[in-house]
């Protein structure tokens, strides 16, 4: 199986850009399905956002486009059989996630990337990431989550007021 997303447009500061994604369900839980939807989880300037990606089948592959804000520091995708809160089948890469740390138009990583990487993988924090992982997911430890928070503090101290509430949960 593979998953790929590529830029399909250009950033305009503070705006969005269009990305194209390609998903191959072969060998996964969604192989052979006739209708799929993609769910995108974005951490945009210290706020979680979710959206859907309408997918169209092209041979064995599924393709779609989505808009990503310029300030998006973390992005994850999950694919499912229907657009419901309780789909009968999902693919999140066996709880390993389809997760990425994007760069802005200048090639720089953005504030929030470390915090999002840690918080997303610790759903017990109630990080507004929905039901990305299965009930069998083993989340990262408090120590690992704190390490990611420490990295955020080290690299982006000027944004501390945005993530102070998250730090109090450890």
Map each language-model feature to its residues.
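Glycan-association/targeting regions that enable binding to alpha-glucans and other polysaccharides
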Residues: 1-170
């Amino acid at each position: 199986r593979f998953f790929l997303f590529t830029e399909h447009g250009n950033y305009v500061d503070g705006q969005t850009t269009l990305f194209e994604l390609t998903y191959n369900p072969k060998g996964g839980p969604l192989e052979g399905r006739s209708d799929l939807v993609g769910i995108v989880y974005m951490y945009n300037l210290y706020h979680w956002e979710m959206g859907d990606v309408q997918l169209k089948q092209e041979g064995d592959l599924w393709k779609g486009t989505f808009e990503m804000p310029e300030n998006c520091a973390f992005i994850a995708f999950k694919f499912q059989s229907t657009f419901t809160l309780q789909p009968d089948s999902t693919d999140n890469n066996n709880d390993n996630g389809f997760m990425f740390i994007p760069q802005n138009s200048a090639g720089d990583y953005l504030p929030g990337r470390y915090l999002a990487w840690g918080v997303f993988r610790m759903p017990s924090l109630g990080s507004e990431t929905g039901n990305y992982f299965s009930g069998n997911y083993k989340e990262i430890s408090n120590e690992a989550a704190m390490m990611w928070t420490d990295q955020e503090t080290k690299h982006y101290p000027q944004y501390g007021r945005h993530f102070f509430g998250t730090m109090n949960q450890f």
